[in-house]
Amino acid sequence: MAKETREIIYLFSSTGNGHFYTTTKNKRSHPEKIKLKKFDPIIKKHITYTEKK
């Protein structure tokens, strides 16, 4: 059976309020950490979410 290349990651809010999103990414083709602008429902604004383990 083939080894999975996609891994589940957590994107945590940069405000530190504890909100996070889960997604998957291909670790082989994108080894760097992801930074995305997404909506934070706690503060009701779009902010930067960063990947953490």
Curated annotation (Swiss-Prot):
Transmembrane segments: none annotated. GO terms for molecular function: structural constituent of ribosome. It comes from the Bacteria. GO terms for biological process: translation. InterPro entries: Ribosomal_bL33, Ribosomal_bL33_sf, Ribosomal_zn-bd. One of its GO terms (cellular component) is cytosolic large ribosomal subunit. Pfam families: Ribosomal_L33. Keywords: Ribonucleoprotein, Ribosomal protein. Belongs to the bacterial ribosomal protein bL33 family. PANTHER family: 54S RIBOSOMAL PROTEIN L39, MITOCHONDRIAL, LARGE RIBOSOMAL SUBUNIT PROTEIN BL33M. This is Large ribosomal subunit protein bL33.
